[in-house]
């Protein structure tokens, strides 16, 4: 899989800098549509978003609430606790061309059971083959500057619950074709 297979690009505007990600809508169409809809505020959700509202962009103001150096950085929870989501779950989309065989892949977090995707996502910072066919891969970080920002976040000091000591905020997400 290469970034030339991208159907859209998302830019996560974070407190550490911009992270540009290619989205693989041809391989994970439901997941990409969910992520884009939540990012743009065009998809309905039944919980409070990270800004405290019930409509509009879901991720704006959320944080990377779980960071494990050498493994991944996780965000997308409006509560910042690891337990929040949009109020619904949706199906997994495993594609044979998408494997956790390299770092910087964007995937959905879940609760360890099938079809429990919601809004939480993570970006890997190493090879994680044990996640194959357990988490839907739907994108990949596209450039070296973005990878450096991911690495900076991954190396951030954390507490015992893997939460960064200094919050790393997703200010907004923009999506382009």
Model-derived features with residue positions:
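Cyclophilin-like peptidyl-prolyl cis-trans isomerases
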Residues: 1-177
């Amino acid at each position: 899989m290469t970034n030339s297979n991208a159907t859209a690009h998302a830019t996560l505007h974070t407190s550490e800098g911009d992270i540009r990600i290619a989205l693989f809508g041809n391989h994970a169409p439901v997941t990409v549509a969910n992520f884009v809809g939540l990012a743009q505020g065009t998809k309905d959700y039944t919980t409070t978003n990270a800004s405290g509202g019930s409509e509009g962009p879901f991720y704006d103001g959320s944080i990377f609430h779980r960071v494990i150096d050498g493994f991944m950085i996780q965000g997308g929870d409006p509560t910042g606790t690891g337990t929040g989501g949009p109020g619904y779950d949706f199906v997994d989309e495993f594609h044979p061309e998408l494997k956790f065989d390299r770092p910087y892949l964007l995937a959905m977090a879940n609760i360890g059971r099938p079809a429990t995707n919601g809004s939480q996502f993570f970006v890997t910072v190493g090879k994680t083959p044990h996640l194959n066919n357990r988490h839907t891969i739907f994108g990949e970080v596209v450039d070296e500057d973005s990878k450096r920002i991911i690495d900076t976040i991954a190396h951030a000091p954390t507490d015992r619950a893997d939460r960064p000591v200094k919050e790393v905020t997703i200010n907004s997400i923009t999506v382009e074709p």
